[in-house]
Curated annotation (Swiss-Prot):
Component of the ubiquinol-cytochrome c reductase complex (complex III or cytochrome b-c1 complex) that is part of the mitochondrial respiratory chain. The b-c1 complex mediates electron transfer from ubiquinol to cytochrome c. Contributes to the generation of a proton gradient across the mitochondrial membrane that is then used for ATP synthesis. CDD domains: cytochrome_b_C, Cytochrome_b_N. The lineage of its organism: Eukaryota, Metazoa, Chordata, Craniata, Vertebrata. It comes from Lepilemur microdon (Small-toothed sportive lemur). It is found in: Mitochondrion inner membrane. Heme 1 (or BL or b562) is low-potential and absorbs at about 562 nm, and heme 2 (or BH or b566) is high-potential and absorbs at about 566 nm. The cytochrome bc1 complex contains 11 subunits: 3 respiratory subunits (MT-CYB, CYC1 and UQCRFS1), 2 core proteins (UQCRC1 and UQCRC2) and 6 low-molecular weight proteins (UQCRH/QCR6, UQCRB/QCR7, UQCRQ/QCR8, UQCR10/QCR9, UQCR11/QCR10 and a cleavage product of UQCRFS1). This cytochrome bc1 complex then forms a dimer. Heme b b566 binds at residues 97, 196. The gene is MT-CYB. InterPro entries: Cyt_b/b6_C (IPR005798), Cyt_b/b6_C_sf (IPR036150), Cyt_b/b6_N (IPR005797), Cytb/b6-like_sf (IPR027387), Cytochrome_b (IPR030689), Cytochrome_b_C_euk/bac (IPR048260), Cytochrome_b_N_euk/bac (IPR048259), Di-haem_cyt_TM (IPR016174). It is a multi-pass membrane protein. Keywords: Electron transport, Heme, Iron, Membrane, Metal-binding, Mitochondrion, Mitochondrion inner membrane, Respiratory chain, Transmembrane, Transmembrane helix, Transport, Ubiquinone. PANTHER family: CYTOCHROME B. Belongs to the cytochrome b family. This is Cytochrome b. Heme b b562 binds at residues 83, 182.
Length: 379
């Protein structure tokens, strides 16, 4: 009698996706981030569910309810900080996952890549709305500033902002709808993850060499389940160290002050994982231009497959492209640092130069380098 996992209608799907899945034998630890993102999403949904049981989405009681969770609910402080720092881990894995896709040319798997970009936007939207919920100073003013950016769109801008706010300013209606959306979006993200995996398993995984693995594959279990488990242990070590030793390291002290519409904080800034995009937004003096640059800073990933004329899929054997890739990483770290600094010299100039370099690398320099490398290899 054959194994039930290979015949049962439901178990068969799980088996073909996670157990008997034919996998390239040479994928490195950088391919772990997909499963780590799945783990992060699971942690966020579970901790979020428990937080939602005690949270009240009302402007008068939201801040108090978060305080109540931390002080009075059994292990509420742990659940709250695992959720908050879990978001940071989520984005850490996301950036590494996208970076690996760029480095090893995974963007050639178009459907998987495009669903991934939709996922990235969805996770960013979810994280932004989650940051508003504690209703501290930075929550309130962050929501006001970021939603107000939509008013830059001609003709419909103001109506669009008031429609999102549910009034003429950020208030009870805004908080309620943000909570509703923050609750439902992770489940939509889970569905998108399944579509992401469906498209990936249509073509099979890429590998560091960028060559076809069809002639030589190994089952996912036990090889990569073990490897992923090691990655998960390291992720949990980092998350638990953050949560139990430095819970507020990545947060903003202003968020421990209840929201006050009459008092603006000296420096309004989002969480660290949005700072690179925030720096690009601030580097352009024009409001609409800044908003367009902000959106394009992520949306540019969608046109990467069109801009890459390289004959070799990965950067593994292309030293010039590797050098530019690490310059891009350094540039993004610079933008992240600038996003957290006040708007004054020399930070304004550094931010503008880093923004120009970011778009130049993506649109001109890296594709041109690919052409040079093709020429050097006589391809």
């Amino acid at each position: 009698m054959t194994n039930i996992r290979k015949n049962h209608p439901l178990l068969k799907i799980i088996n073909n996706s996670f157990i008997d899945l034919p996998t390239p034998p040479n994928i490195s630890s950088l391919w772990n981030f997909g499963s780590l993102l799945g783990a992060c999403l699971t942690i966020q949904i579970i901790t979020g569910l428990f937080l939602a049981m005690h949270y009240t989405a009302d402007t008068t009681t939201a801040f108090s309810s978060v305080t109540h969770i931390c002080r009075d609910v059994n292990y509420g402080w742990a659940i709250r900080y695992i959720h908050a720092n879990g978001a940071s881990m989520f984005f850490l894995c996301l950036f590494a996952h996208v970076g690996r896709g760029l480095y090893y040319g995974s963007f050639t798997l178009l459907e998987t890549w495009n669903v991934g970009i939709i996922l990235l936007f969805s996770v960013m939207a979810t994280a932004f709305m989650g940051y508003v919920l504690p209703w501290g100073q930075m929550s309130f003013w962050g929501a006001t500033v970021i939603t107000n950016l939509l008013s830059a769109f001609p003709y419909v801008g103001t109506d669009l902002v008031e429609w999102i706010w549910g009034g003429f300013s950020v208030g009870k209606a805004t908080l309620t709808r943000f909570f509703a959306l923050h609750f439902i979006l992770p489940f939509i993200i889970s569905a998108l993850v399944m579509i992401h995996l469906l498209f990936l398993h249509e073509t099979g995984s890429n590998n560091p060499l960028g060559t076809s693995s069809n002639s030589d594959k190994i089952p996912f279990h036990p090889y990569y389940t073990t490897k992923d488990f090691l990655g998960l242990l390291l992720l949990m070590l980092l998350l638990m160290t953050l949560t139990f030793f430095y819970p507020d390291l990545l947060g903003d002290p202003d968020n421990y002050t209840p929201a006050n519409p009459l008092n603006t904080p000296p420096h309004i800034k989002p969480e660290w994982y949005f700072l690179f995009a925030y720096a690009i937004l601030r580097s352009i003096p024009n409001k609409l231009g800044g908003v367009m640059a902000l959106i394009l800073s992520i949306l540019i990933l969608a046109i990467i497959p069109l801009l890459q004329p390289n004959k070799q899929q990965t950067m593994m054997f292309r030293p010039l492209s590797q050098f530019l890739f690490w310059i891009l990483v350094a540039d993004l770290l610079t933008l992240t640092w600038i996003g957290g600094q006040p708007v004054e010299d020399p930070f304004i100039n550094i931010g503008q130069m880093a923004s120009i370099l970011y778009f130049s690398l993506m649109i001109f320099i890296m594709p041109m380098t690919c052409l040079i490398e093709n020429k050097m290899l006589k391809w």
